Amino acid sequence: SGRPLHLDISDEPMKKGIITNRNKFVLGGSGSGKSFFMNHLVRQYWEQGTHVVLVDTGNSYQGLCELIRRKTKGEDGVYFTYTEEHPISFNPFYTDDYYFDVEKKDSIKTLLLTLWKTEDDKITKTESGELGSAVNAYIERIRADRNIVPCFDSFYEYLRDDYRRELEEREIRVSREDFNIDNMLITLRQYYKGGRYDFLLNSRANIDLLSKRFVVFEVDSIKENKELFPVVTIIIMEAFINKMRRLKGVRKQLIVEEAWKALSTANMAEYLRYMYKTVRKYYGEAIVVTQEVEDIISSPVVKEAIINNSDCKILLDQRKFMNRFDAIQSLLGLTDKEKAQILSINQSNDPSRKYKEVWIGLGGVQSAVYATEVSVPEYLAYTTEETEKVEVQRLAGELGGDMELAIRQLAEGKR
C-alpha cells in the first residue's frame, strides 16, 4: 500500500510470547538489498539507544559509521579495519578487579581450545577438563601474586613450567593420548612472545567498547586466513560479551556478517551456544547475516547453534536460490504459507517507487512481506553501488569531510 509502518521485531513480540529471544537470522543473495536493509535496521536501533557492534567483511557500514561519527563530533562511530600494521589485539585475562566468573573462565578455555585444535580435531573431555583446571590454577596464581601481569604470555609460561611439572608428579598419571600438553605448547608457541602472532593476545590496552555505541570491525583482509580469522572473530565477540555484562538495562546488538563462517566448525559450536545463552541473559541480540546458502545448508553447527536460537527470520529476494529453496525451507522450518510469502518478494513491485521487499517471520507465528523504502538522502548514505559511493566520498572530500552535507547536496540534485 506504500503506507509507512512502525514495526517492532524485538520487544513487543517478546512481551507477547511470540518469540523467546531477540536474535535474528538474515538471508539474502547479493543484489537482494540485504546490506541496504541492514543499514536501515541498524540506524534505527542506534537512534533508539542501542549499543551496536558489527563484524563486517565488505565495508557495507562505512557510510553509516562515518555519518554517526560526524553527528556525534567523533564521540561515537568507531571503525576498526584489520591490517597488518594495525591488527586487532586484546587480552583474554584482563579484568578491572581480578574477578573471573564461571562464564569468563569458560570463554578463556574455549578460546584456548580453538587456538590449539584445527577444525577437524576432536576435543576430548580430558583435554577440556585439564585446560579448564590450568586456567583456574593460573587465575589463583595471579590473584595471589599481583606482580604477575595477567596476559597470554604469563599463562603460557605457567602452563610450560608449573602445570606441566604438576601433571608429571600426579599420583594418577594423565597419558599423552588423553592430554598432550607438549603438543599444545608447540601449537600455542606462535601466540607467545617472539612468535608471529604474539601481538594478538597480549594487548596492554584492552579494547574498550563500553562508552562507544556504534563500533564496526572490518575484517575483510583476513577472511581467507584460516588461523587468524576465527581467533580475531572470537576476540571481537569476547569484547562484545564483556560489554554486555557490564552495561545493564541497555540493548546490545552484535551483528556478524559473513564472519560467522569462522565460527561454523564443530569445535566452535560450544562457544556459539555459550554466546547465544549469554546474549539472551543480558538484554542483547545476536544477528547473523549471510548470502551463502550452500554454507548454511551444509553446516549442522549453523542449524543447531544459530538458526535454532534465532526466533526472528528475515529473508530477502530468494530467486537466486529457487532450485535450493526446499532445503532452505526445511532448514528454517518454514510453513508452506511462509514459503509462498517469501517467493512473492519483488514479484509485483510498483515501478513508480524505488524499494525492495523483505519477509520478516517471528517465532513461526507471525509473518509478512514489507517494503524497505527510504528517502533519497538515506539511500545515498547506505548505497553499496560503487559509482554512487565514490561520488558521495568525492564530494565529502571537497567539503572538508562533511558527509552529511555531501549527501544533502547530491540528494537535491537527484530530486
Region roles according to the model:
Residues 1-5, 11, 59-76, 82-284, ...:
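P-loop NTPase motor domains
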Residues 1-81:
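Glycine-rich phosphate-binding loop of nucleotide-binding enzymes
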Residues 5-8, 15-18, 35, 63, ...:
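Short helix/loop capping segments that flank catalytic or ligand/cofactor-binding pockets
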Residues 15, 19-29, 41, 131-168, ...:
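Charge-patterned, long linear interaction tracts outside catalytic cores
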Residues 29-31, 247, 293-415:
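C-terminal regions of RecA-like/P-loop NTPase motor modules
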Residues 52-55, 77-82, 285-289, 313-317:
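Short hydrophobic alpha-helical runs that function as membrane-insertion/retention elements
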Residues 58, 217, 292, 319:
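Residues in the short beta-alpha loop(s) of Rossmann-like NAD(P)-binding domains
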